Amino acid sequence: MNEELQNQFMALDVYNQQVQKLQEELSNIDLMIMELVRAIESMESLKTSGEIMLPLGAGSFVKADVKNPEKIILSVGVDVLLEKDVEEVILDFKNSLDELEKTKELITTQIQKTSKEVTRIRGELEKRAAAIEKQSQTKRGHSGSN
């Protein structure tokens, strides 16, 4: 196999790995988006009812009344907590959602570009394989007539 063909196969492999990593990143972003949306919904509900469902584990929950539903305590690092107004946290989370959506669009665009390149390289490799096969058949045909 010539060097150019080997390079195309290697490029194809690299591009496929890139697409896979980007798709994994998209999945992670989707999980973060879902988590933020749930948190925003919970805080919105908390503002009106003062009641929240606390997870106990294994799919079980308990309803609880919140003493101060206007304040949210955020973990901002290892053993570091920060108290903020619920409206401020909701706004921060919505801003984070916007940023995640923008990142998601960029990654999706990159996946599309990389996938097009994969398709282009595959097409070239298929043409070369067909040409090699045709050349091989032609050689066999000529050697059989001797």
Swiss-Prot record:
This is Prefoldin subunit alpha. Belongs to the prefoldin alpha subunit family. The keyword Ion transport does not apply. It is found in: Cytoplasm. Its main location: cytoplasm. Heterohexamer of two alpha and four beta subunits. SUPFAM superfamilies: Prefoldin. It comes from the Archaea. The gene is pfdA. GO terms for molecular function: unfolded protein binding. Molecular chaperone capable of stabilizing a range of proteins. Seems to fulfill an ATP-independent, HSP70-like function in archaeal de novo protein folding. GO terms for biological process: protein folding. The keyword tRNA processing does not apply. Keywords: Chaperone, Cytoplasm.
